[in-house]
A protein has these predicted regions:
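Non-catalytic DNA-binding core/recognition domains of DNA-processing enzymes
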Residues: 17-78
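N-terminal DNA-binding module of tyrosine recombinases/phage integrases
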Residues: 1-6, 74
Length: 78
């Protein structure tokens, strides 16, 4: 389960992203969570990339999701 509100606050505090970009980033994390329930582990990205639903996204969307998940993992580390 994605901690959306806490993640938004973390992004506001730790990045220079606009509110729109923060909203997009949270949305991408939720899309990843819909493919494969998100969990705090280095291998999550590995398994996500092998998910059939994830593979249907365009290369650009997959790249955006990977970046968002990477940020979310950093958020969970703190």
């Amino acid at each position: 389960m994605v901690k959306a509100e806490q993640f938004k606050e973390w992004l506001k505090k730790n990045t220079t992203y606009s509110d729109a970009v923060i909203g997009d980033t949270v949305s991408r994390v939720k899309r990843a969570d819909n493919c494969l329930e998100i969990y705090h582990d280095d291998v999550y990205q590995f398994y996500l990339e092998r998910d059939e639903h994830y593979k249907t996204f365009s290369v650009a969307v997959r790249s955006q999701i990977k970046k968002a998940v990477s940020l979310y993992q950093r958020f969970l580390d703190e």
